[in-house]
């Protein structure tokens, strides 16, 4: 549905040359929710704006639904953009128009008959859960409701693709979850292809099928969400994954934690489980095999792309030789082990 090939984007600021994107290629199959994640300034907003040519690539090809956009005339591009809806971090609603009027605007600009506008807008407001807000003005809506209006407006022309540019960044966590569930529902109901950009791995984890990691204008990793969470290939991907599961060392342990071993100490371990290692009874197996005891301090588990993953803080009691053997055995069974110190 979306195929970006060798996209490069260069900006000129006086004598400065800024390369925002460098030879980026990305394929989003029809009907998928595809996430692009990166830190601020990584190039993700520039990338998504290249899809509908709000930013025209310096080099490269942009195919949407089999149509090459970079070679179209202005009138042809305007027509092609009707198949590409877009929502933003800021809702960009017209304060002088009601909810109905905001959603109706693209249909009015397309000279759609009034009875068809009424039918379509009513249908869309029901879809986004605002069936009772036809006559409300944006000033009377919450942030989540405003974004729902923006989503309805983006769907007014019945597009095949929806672009989401940090669409939940300005929302509180509960509202973010509700908007993401709405996008997932729209994807299922309409078969809509969704490309979203974000700096939050929680967003990717919650609704995406595939994810690409962008850094300094380059895609450094891309795969299914389950594969990236199970086997991240780059330090940046690992960092984003760790941000979704974070366990703080309890304060009483922090006060006692030492960097080097001392007499009668035990190591404190941070264990990361993904895929099959989550469900296997690995800790009890280490106890049987290596005569060690594990005191679990805290643990957290979650799902992403249908794959379970989690982290755990534990003390491992046993002789130095036994604990080292147990740690090596865990690592052999795809558990990432970090020795945080000794208590």
Curated annotation (Swiss-Prot):
GO cellular component annotations of the record: Gram-negative-bacterium-type cell wall; plasma membrane
Subcellular location: Cell inner membrane
Gene Ontology molecular function, alphabetical: ABC-type D-methionine transporter activity; ATP binding; ATP hydrolysis activity
EC category name: translocase
Family matches, as Gene3D superfamilies: 3.30.70.260, P-loop containing nucleotide triphosphate hydrolases
Entry-linked PROSITE patterns: ABC_TRANSPORTER_1, ABC_TRANSPORTER_2, METN
EC number: 7.4.2.11
Keywords, alphabetical: Amino-acid transport, ATP-binding, Cell inner membrane, Cell membrane, Membrane, Nucleotide-binding, Translocase, Transport
Domain annotation ABC transporter: ranges: 2-241
Principal localisation: membrane
Catalytic activity, reaction form: L-methionine(out) + ATP + H2O = L-methionine(in) + ADP + phosphate + H(+); D-methionine(out) + ATP + H2O = D-methionine(in) + ADP + phosphate + H(+)
Residues annotated as binding ATP: 38-45
Family: Belongs to the ABC transporter superfamily. Methionine importer (TC 3.A.1.24) family.
PANTHER family: AMINO ACID IMPORT ATP-BINDING PROTEIN, METHIONINE IMPORT ATP-BINDING PROTEIN METN
Subunit structure: The complex is composed of two ATP-binding proteins (MetN), two transmembrane proteins (MetI) and a solute-binding protein (MetQ).
Protein name per its UniProtKB record: Methionine import ATP-binding protein MetN
Species annotation: Shigella boydii serotype 4 (strain Sb227)
Gene it is expressed from: metN
């Amino acid at each position: 549905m979306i195929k970006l090939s060798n996209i490069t984007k260069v900006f000129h600021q006086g004598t400065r040359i800024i390369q925002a994107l460098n030879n980026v290629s990305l394929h989003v199959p029809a009907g998928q929710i595809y996430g692009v994640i990166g830190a601020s300034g990584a190039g993700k907003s520039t990338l998504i704006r290249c899809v509908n040519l709000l930013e025209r690539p310096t080099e490269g090809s942009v195919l949407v639904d089999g149509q090459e956009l970079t070679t179209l005339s202005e009138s042809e591009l305007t027509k092609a953009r009707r198949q590409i809806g877009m929502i933003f971090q800021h809702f960009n609603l017209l304060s002088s128009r009601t909810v109905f009027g905001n959603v109706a605007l693209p249909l009015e600009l397309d000279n759609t008959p009034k009875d068809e506008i009424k039918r379509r807008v009513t249908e869309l407001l029901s879809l986004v859960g605002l069936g009772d807000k036809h006559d409300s003005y944006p000033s009377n809506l919450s942030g989540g409701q405003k974004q729902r209006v923006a989503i309805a407006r983006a769907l007014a022309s019945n597009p095949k693709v929806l672009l989401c540019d940090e669409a939940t960044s300005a929302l509180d966590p509960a509202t973010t979850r509700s908007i993401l569930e709405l996008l997932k529902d729209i994807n299922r109901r309409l078969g809509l292809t969704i490309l979203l950009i974000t700096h939050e791995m929680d967003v990717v984890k919650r609704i995406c099928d595939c994810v690409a990691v962008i850094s300094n204008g380059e895609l450094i990793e891309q795969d299914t969400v389950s594969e990236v969470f199970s086997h991240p290939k780059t330090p940046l991907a690992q960092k984003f994954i760790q941000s979704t599961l974070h366990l703080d060392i309890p304060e009483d342990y922090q006060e006692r934690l030492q960097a080097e071993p001392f007499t009668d100490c035990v190591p404190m371990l941070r264990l990361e489980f993904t895929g099959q290692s989550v469900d296997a009874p690995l800790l009890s197996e280490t106890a049987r095999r290596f005569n060690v005891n594990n005191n679990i301090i805290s643990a957290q588990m979650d799902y992403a792309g249908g794959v379970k993953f989690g982290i755990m803080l534990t003390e491992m009691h046993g002789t130095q030789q036994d604990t080292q053997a147990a740690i090596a055995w865990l690592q052999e069974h795809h558990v990432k082990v970090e020795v945080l110190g000794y208590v």
